[in-house]
Amino acid sequence: MNPDIVQTVYLDIYDCRSEYDFYNKFAVALMKQTANKMELAIENIKQFLVRLSPKISFSPDPVSDYSISLGITPKEYSPEEILELPELLAKRIGKHIVVCIDEFQQIGEWQDSITVQKRLRGVWQHQQHVSYCLFGSKQHMMTHLF
């Protein structure tokens, strides 16, 4: 893929235990991986997640990256608003975004997972500037989801 026209975003959701754990991890991955500098990630947060006060942490190890905590809850943002972020970011940066989600079968373990799956499909199917790659290590669970 041409990096000038395609931006890949990867997240592993193995440790996500709930729908809003996923939305937080999803939004952080998008903000960090579509920005080439921390300053741009912060600008993206200010533009697209204006109702949040992110917490940014730095590691004393100069090799380590910074981390962002958004604390997204249903009070601040609806699931649909978070799921629309890739499309909004793709338009802003002028690239097609490919979101790769590993351990996708975890969604099947969440409370009300059928509703979450319908919500994801309902939003994602209308996005024109974003593609999704869904990976899972438990074939039977992935088959059940689809």
Language-model features and meaning:
Residues E84-P86, Q117-G122:
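A generic local structural motif
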Residues M1-I97, S113, V130:
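P-loop NTPase nucleotide-binding core
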Residues K91-C100, Q106-D112, R119-F146:
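Sensor-1/coupling segment of RecA-like P-loop NTPase cores
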